[in-house]
A protein has these predicted regions:
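Walker A (P-loop) phosphate-binding motif
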Residues: 97-118
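N-terminal leader/targeting and accessory segments in enzymes
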Residues: 1-96, 100
Length: 118
């Protein structure tokens, strides 16, 4: 999957959003982050990424951002939002972080699960 120049929307910045931002920026994507929490909840974490061109929409979600994206990557803790469903219905691809990572793996994959898939 070519990410260079593509508009990628990350939904939820909390735990894995930073790593995902770095990954996407390293592949030339134009990154936008949408999170329901206000910017103040993240302290200075946003500053470095904003300086690298990441656009932050904090304190709520703009439906337009979902429809304008070339790809949406919701964080694992994000519930199935109406904005994500609407974008998917319009043909915008929605991939989990794991699905996106899989597309860039070059080696063999071994999957091991425990009880009840944990």
């Amino acid at each position: 999957m070519e990410l260079r120049g593509r508009n990628v929307l990350i939904v939820g910045f909390e735990r894995t959003g930073e790593a995902l931002c770095r990954f996407l920026l390293g592949r030339g994507a134009r990154v936008r982050v949408s999170d329901k929490k206000p910017a103040e909840a993240f302290g200075t974490k946003l500053d470095d990424f904003a300086g690298r061109g990441v656009v932050f929409e904090m304190g709520g979600h703009r439906p337009e951002s979902f429809l304008e994206a070339d790809l949406i990557v919701p964080s694992p803790g994000v519930p199935p939002l109406a904005e994500i469903r609407a974008a998917r219905e319009k043909g915008v691809p929605v991939l989990s972080e794991i699905e996106l990572a899989y597309l860039f793996l070059r080696g063999r994959i071994v999957a091991i699960t425990g009880s009840n898939g944990k």
